Amino acid sequence: MPNRDTLFSAPIAKLGDWTFDERVAEVFPDMIQRSVPGYSNIISMIGMLAERFVQPDSQVYDLGCSLGAATLSMRRNIKVAGCNIIAVDNSPAMVERCRRHIDAFRADTPVEVIEADILDIKIENASMVVLNFTLQFLEPADRLRLLEQVYRGLRPGGALVLSEKFSFEDADVGELLFNMHHDFKRANGYSELEISQKRSMLENVMLTDSVAAHKTRLKQAGFEHAEVWFQCFNFGSLIALKSGAAA
C-alpha cells in the first residue's frame, strides 16, 4: 500500500510554492491517484500506445518521469528489439525513488533514469516521447521550445503523448469541470483544508492551457496531427504525430 497523503491535513502558517520534494515523493502515488481523475487509465493506455508506436532500435523518452509509472507501463508493452527508455526528472527525491521502482521490475528494455532539466535533454532517434503532466510546470515561454526539440528528435511516424490539466475558454464549462474535480477529490477523502492549501501552493507554478492553445502550439512545433485521446473533467491527454512512415 502506498503511503497516504496527509501533507496538508493540518493548517500551514506559511504556504510557499509547490515543489516535488522528499515529502511529496514519499506520498506521490497516493496523491496522484486521489487528485488526478483518470490517471490510472492514462498510464495503462500509454503502455498500449507504446506497443503501437515504439519502433525497433529507437529511443523512448519519459520527460518529467516522477516515479516512473509511464516508463514502467511502456516497458511492459514494448514488443520490439533494440529500444532504450530515457526517463528524466529534475527532482532528486523523485529520481532516487524512480530508480528503485525501475530496478524492482525485470524487463528486456533498458531504462536510464537521469536527474536533469528536461530542456537540457537532447531528443534524438525517438519513436515515442511522453510528457505526462509535465509541460504545465514549465514557464510558458519555454513550452514551444521544448515541443520543437521533441518534434526534431522524433522519427517519422513517431508520437508525443502530452497529458495536462486543462483550462477552458468557456467560463461556465470551466467552472463546472473545476467543481466536478473538487467533488472527485472530496470523494477520495481530501478535506476542504487539504484541497485549498494544495491549490494555493500550486497556483503560481502550475499554469494550465486550453486544448486549443495546446493544439496551436503543437502545430507551431511542427506536428502534423494532434488530438485529445482521453479526458476526464479538466484533465486529459493529447497525442501528436510526426508524419511519415516508420523507418
Swiss-Prot record:
An annotated Gene Ontology molecular function: S-adenosyl-L-methionine binding
CDD domains named in the record: AdoMet_MTases (cd02440)
Keyword terms: S-adenosyl-L-methionine, Transferase
Reaction(s) catalysed (UniProt annotation): prephenate + S-adenosyl-L-methionine = carboxy-S-adenosyl-L-methionine + 3-phenylpyruvate + H2O
Disulfide bond residue pairs: none
Chain positions recorded as S-adenosyl-L-methionine binding sites: Y39, G64, C65, S66, D89, N90, D117, I118, N132, R199
InterPro entries assigned: CmoA, Methyltransf_25, SAM-dependent_MTases_sf
E.C. designation(s): 2.1.3.-
Domain of life: Bacteria
GO BP term, pick one: tRNA wobble uridine modification
Top EC class of this enzyme: transferase
Cited function: Catalyzes the conversion of S-adenosyl-L-methionine (SAM) to carboxy-S-adenosyl-L-methionine (Cx-SAM).
Family: Belongs to the class I-like SAM-binding methyltransferase superfamily. Cx-SAM synthase family.
Subunit structure and binding partners: Homodimer.
Protein name: Carboxy-S-adenosyl-L-methionine synthase
Organism of this sequence: Serratia proteamaculans (strain 568)
Gene assigned in the entry: cmoA
